[in-house]
From Swiss-Prot:
HAMAP family: PyrE. Belongs to the purine/pyrimidine phosphoribosyltransferase family. PyrE subfamily. Homodimer. This is Orotate phosphoribosyltransferase. Pfam families: Pribosyltran. Its EC number is 2.4.2.10. It comes from Thermococcus kodakarensis (strain ATCC BAA-918 / JCM 12380 / KOD1).
Length: 185
């Protein structure tokens, strides 16, 4: 494990971004834990690290892309930081088309044939990020890969991986393995 990835995992605990209790997830599933990536993506140091890790992973895997996109709300700061890190234009995918103005479901420009690196904060089943991919593809974009900060390992990798390259920075099993390790003073 890289030092940077190790640092990101440590940040989840330092920032208390893993909560235990009873939670209903975006997927509709009930869970006894919640991964709150927003606690990290609202902290400049953590957000920079996430962007650096994502850019490095894309480069390591040979993933080329013209634009960075993320679905609202959780992925917007992540996509923004990655766009700044890579100097690629940003696209924000709305959950629903605007009811005013242009009525667009996208903020930012996508041209036919653009390769888009689509990012997400957390995946469970992958439904939210797949809906965003469909919106981008309707505009003519090609999804270069889907990258996520944390995969909960509840089916997203299989579902997304059936059609796209799926790259989680951290799997929930890696977070929980760290939780069980003795903490360094």
């Amino acid at each position: 494990m890289s030092d940077s990835k190790d640092e990101l995992i440590r940040m989840f605990f330092d920032e208390e971004a893993i909560l235990f209790g009873r939670f209903i997830l975006t997927s509709g599933k009930e869970s006894n834990y919640y991964i709150n990536v927003k606690k990290l993506s609202t902290k400049p140091r953590a957000l920079k690290l996430i962007a650096k890790l994502m850019a490095g992973e894309a480069q390591k895997r040979g993933i080329t892309f013209d634009r960075v996109a993320g679905p609202e709300l959780g992925a917007v700061p992540i996509a923004t930081a990655l766009a700044l890190e890579t100097e690629k234009p940003l696209v924000i995918v709305r959950k629903k088309p605007k009811g005013h103005g242009t009525g667009s479901q996208l903020e930012g420009e996508v041209k036919a044939g653009d390769k888009v690196l689509l990012v997400e904060d957390v995946t469970t089943t992958g439904g939210s990020v797949l809906r965003a991919a469909e919106v981008l593809e309707r505009e003519g974009a090609e999804i270069a890969a889907i990258m996520v900060v944390v995969d909960r390992e509840e089916g997203a990798e299989e579902t997304i991986g059936a059609k796209y390259t799926f790259l989680p920075l951290v799997r929930v099993s890696e977070l929980f393995a760290r939780r069980k390790e003795p903490q360094k003073e």
